[in-house]
């Protein structure tokens, strides 16, 4: 889904996760807008934080309110979980959302409800671009092609 993520970013995610010994470390992206090649980020989940910057949840855009859809910090779904925590909690996922799907992002809510820590790393916007359609593939290719 995120073909432009670099090995350096994955290493940073893993290193941060191991250093901080948290249940979850995740990448986040702050987009300046949802125009041009950044339009695909509009479909990404929004990061909801409290006044102190602590993550409260990541809400899928399909389930977000109009106000929440204005949030420009998005979730590219790049995670590093504590393995033992993950295996103990996967079966707790529910599909009680508009789509009737199981959302991996619901694990964030479980981490929060269990008062476990979440660490985030901000990554380069271009690395986080998702490719699920022909248009998104063209956008990703345009980011790789140097302009003359």
Model regions and ranges:
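Conserved beta-loop-beta/alpha segment of the NTase-like Rossmann-fold superfamily
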Residues: 1-51, 80, 88-89
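Catalytic-core segments of class I nucleotidyltransferases/pyrophosphorylases
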Residues: 55-126, 135-138, 142-146
């Amino acid at each position: 889904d995120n073909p432009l993520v670099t090995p350096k970013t994955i290493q940073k995610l893993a290193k941060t996760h191991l250093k901080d010994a948290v249940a979850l470390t995740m990448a986040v992206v702050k987009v300046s807008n949802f125009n041009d090649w950044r339009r695909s980020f509009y479909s990404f989940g929004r990061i909801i934080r409290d006044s102190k910057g602590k993550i409260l949840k990541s809400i899928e855009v399909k389930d977000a309110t109009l106000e929440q859809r204005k949030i420009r910090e998005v979730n590219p779904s790049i995670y590093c979980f504590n393995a033992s925590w993950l295996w103990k909690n996967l079966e707790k996922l529910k599909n009680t959302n508009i789509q009737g799907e199981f959302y991996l992002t619901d694990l964030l809510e479980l981490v929060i409800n269990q008062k476990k820590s979440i660490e985030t790393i901000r990554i380069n916007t271009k690395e986080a671009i998702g490719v699920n359609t022909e248009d998104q593939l063209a956008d990703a290719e345009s980011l790789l092609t140097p302009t003359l």
